[in-house]
């Protein structure tokens, strides 16, 4: 049988052995032609504990890294966007990942203040799945919920006229089924999680 695992939960390692195996595969693929062990940069949430930092470093070392550089995710995201964070001006950056939302103010190449919550993309997907199951008797997998979120999900000003057909399995008959949902309906399904994310940003 096929077992699917999530080695990362909430932005930190939840399955140490799986993350170590995954890192070994990634390093082997990226460093096929290298004679020496590579130096590795790891992105970590800005709110991780010292224990979680050490776990990330240890996993990378066991996977074959020679040296590890830990970069806080908001800094990495800002650099990836081409945002100039070297000036003495505050830049608000919100990173909504899978397991965590990080809200940070960056200035002078550093995180000045930060806040984090464990409500993010995965929680929004689950809210959509729960709504379709409870209100439409339709079971959908996480990839379908993700697609719904990307296609008609919104955080403000939902359009009640915008619609999407969602396919899944009908809970009563067990047969393939579908439902037409509106953007307003999906926004309402995610409302509680969106409020938590907004509170994290304002916090």
Tell what function each PLM region has.
Residues 99:
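Conserved Rossmann-like nucleotide-cofactor binding loop
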Residues 1-96, 104-203:
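Nucleotide/phosphate-binding catalytic cleft detector across ATP-hydrolyzing
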């Amino acid at each position: 049988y096929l077992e699917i695992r999530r080695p990362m939960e909430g932005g930190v390692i939840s399955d140490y052995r799986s993350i170590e195996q995954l890192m070994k595969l990634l390093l082997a693929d990226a460093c096929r032609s290298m004679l020496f062990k590579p130096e590795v940069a790891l992105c970590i949430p800005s709110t991780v504990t010292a224990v979680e930092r050490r776990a990330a470093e240890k996993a990378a070392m066991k996977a074959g890294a020679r040296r590890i550089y830990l970069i806080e995710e908001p800094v990495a995201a800002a650099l990836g966007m081409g945002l100039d964070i070297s000036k003495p001006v505050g830049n608000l950056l919100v990173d909504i990942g899978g397991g965590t939302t990080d809200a940070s103010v960056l200035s002078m190449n550093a995180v000045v203040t930060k806040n984090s919550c464990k409500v993010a993309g995965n929680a929004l997907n689950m809210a959509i799945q729960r709504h379709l199951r409870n209100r439409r008797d339709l079971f959908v997998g996480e990839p379908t919920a993700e697609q719904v979120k990307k296609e008609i999900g919104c955080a403000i000003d939902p359009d009640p006229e915008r619609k999407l057909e969602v396919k899944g399995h009908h809970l009563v008959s067990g047969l393939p089924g579908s439902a037409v949902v509106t953007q307003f309906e999906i926004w309402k399904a995610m409302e509680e999680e969106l409020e938590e994310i907004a509170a994290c940003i304002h916090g």
